Each structure stands twice: as structure tokens, then as C-alpha cells.
Amino acid sequence: MIDGQSLVLAASAIGAGLAMIAGIGAGIGQGFAAGKGAESVGRQPDAQGDIIRTMLLGAAVAETTGIYALVIALLLLFANPLIGML
């Protein structure tokens, strides 16, 4: 029989793993943005500054989901508030 604490720890590990899958989406999105940015600079070299600025802003916004997922995963693994409720 599984006790409550073991069940919470197992569910937390699964949840942390699922949260880290969000990092895949952020990486794919940043890859597409960098590719399209390089393509745009190749087509319009005069607008390089504006294109790079917009691309970096978009990459920063896309990265926030990965950072939030990492924070949630670390909280679930190392500072789990649910264990104290048992």
C-alpha cells in the first residue's frame, strides 16, 4: 500500500517532468524566431537593427514560459509545500 507522502512525491516528480516539457516549446519557438530573423536580415540588410531588436524581444518573451516551468519544477522537487499538508 502506498502512503500519502510517497504518492505526493511521485506525483510531484511526474508534474516536474511535465513542466519541463514546456522548455521544449520555448526552444522550438526561439529557433523559429532566430531562423526567420536571419532570413529577414538576408532580405533587408538595411533594417538589421530593427529586426534584431524585435527578434530579441520576442525571444525574451518566449523564454519566460521556460523559466516559469523551471521554477515550478524546482519548487515541486525541492520545496514541495504539499508534503507539509499531510
From Swiss-Prot:
PROSITE patterns: ATPASE_C
Statement: the UniProt record of this protein carries the keyword Ion transport: yes
One protein family per Pfam: ATP-synt_C
Chain positions of site Reversibly protonated during proton transport: 63
Membrane topology recorded in Swiss-Prot or TrEMBL: Multi-pass membrane protein
InterPro entries: ATP_synth_csu_bac/chlpt, ATP_synth_F0_csu, ATP_synth_F0_csu_DDCD_BS, ATPase_proteolipid_c-like_dom, F/V-ATP_Csub_sf
GO cellular component: plasma membrane; proton-transporting ATP synthase complex; proton-transporting two-sector ATPase complex, proton-transporting domain
Membrane-spanning intervals of the chain: 8-28, 66-86
Cell compartment(s), UniProt: Cell membrane
Keyword Nucleotide-binding among record annotations: no
Alphabetical keyword list: ATP synthesis, Cell membrane, CF(0), Hydrogen ion transport, Ion transport, Lipid-binding, Membrane, Transmembrane, Transmembrane helix, Transport
Record-linked CDD domains: ATP-synt_Fo_c_NaATPase
GO MF entry, a single one: lipid binding
Assembly: F-type ATPases have 2 components, F(1) - the catalytic core - and F(0) - the membrane proton channel. F(1) has five subunits: alpha(3), beta(3), gamma(1), delta(1), epsilon(1). F(0) has three main subunits: a(1), b(2) and c(10-14). The alpha and beta chains form an alternating ring which encloses part of the gamma chain. F(1) is attached to F(0) by a central stalk formed by the gamma and epsilon chains, while a peripheral stalk is formed by the delta and b chains.
Family: Belongs to the ATPase C chain family.
Function as written in the Swiss-Prot or TrEMBL entry: F(1)F(0) ATP synthase produces ATP from ADP in the presence of a proton or sodium gradient. F-type ATPases consist of two structural domains, F(1) containing the extramembraneous catalytic core and F(0) containing the membrane proton channel, linked together by a central stalk and a peripheral stalk. During catalysis, ATP synthesis in the catalytic domain of F(1) is coupled via a rotary mechanism of the central stalk subunits to proton translocation. Key component of the F(0) channel; it plays a direct role in translocation across the membrane. A homomeric c-ring of between 10-14 subunits forms the central stalk rotor element with the F(1) delta and epsilon subunits.
Matching NCBIfam families: ATP_synt_c (TIGR01260)
Protein name: ATP synthase subunit c
Organism: Natranaerobius thermophilus (strain ATCC BAA-1301 / DSM 18059 / JW/NM-WN-LF)
Organism taxonomic ancestry: Bacteria, Bacillati, Bacillota, Clostridia, Natranaerobiales
Designated gene of the protein: atpE
